[in-house]
Amino acid sequence: MRCGLRGLTLVGLACLAGLAVAQAPDGGGFLQPGYLNLVDVILPAPIAQEPRGVADREIFKSTRAMKGSERWTMAIGDVPSDPASMMRGFACAARVPMTPANAPKTVALLEKASRDTASETNQLKSYYKKKRPFLLDPGETCEVLSDEYRVSYDYPSGHATKGWTWALVLAELLDDRAAPIMARGRAYGESRVVCGVHNMSAVEAGRMVASSTLAVVRTEPAYQDAVVAARRELAALRKIGAAPSAQACSAEEAVVNQPIYR
């Protein structure tokens, strides 16, 4: 924790008392719950009849035509957000065959940082209570819509938040692969638009939540120590692990780089 952050009065007092209030308890993220409040940082959720809302609805309608395409298939593959699935999803971009078993320090870092960013996203979802796109306009989705989807909120996107969190952290760990890693993180969030379960504004807000939260998380000594350990782990894995198939990765990159709207 850095004691010079403005606007956090309780934190400032705790610094004077020598208390590290930003550090979360075991099992949480790197920050204490409630340490941040991003309501004034993230743009308000769009209103359906206003310009941002109209753009969301048009993008939702136009991307329904992607059903059956390679981009639609990628969106289906991006639905699972468990660590093993996400490591597979980023393996080509990273050029490292990561798994929770062979990179435990890396996955622990990614998941711990993701708990911080998810906490902020969940607070904003509850604050704005924005309906998902398929509740406003008809259109097919790439996954079965459970009751949980129908009663949960659109803005910001939790998947986009987590995907961008992973991308930013992995880019820090593997800086020579930063551009393709961040491109994959962008595409991971956009998959929710292709899938039809989130609006584009929700994906953009999810990225902003991840970036804003990580700006503070990165000041934590525990995070910095975890980065050093994960970087060493991935460097060792690069030396002994077989890189993902170049042909398969080339095909994936072509889909990642495909714009979903103009």
Region roles according to the model:
Residues 1-9:
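Bacterial N-terminal signal peptides that target proteins for export
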Residues 17-19:
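N-terminal signal peptide c-region/cleavage motif recognized by signal peptidases
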Residues 24-194, 222, 226, 232-234, ...:
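Hydrophobic alpha-helical bundle signature of multipass membrane enzymes
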Residues 152-153, 198, 209, 228, ...:
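Short alpha-helix boundary/capping motifs
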Residues 188-218:
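Interfacial helix-loop-helix junctions of multi-pass membrane proteins
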Residues 214-262:
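C-terminal membrane module of polytopic membrane proteins
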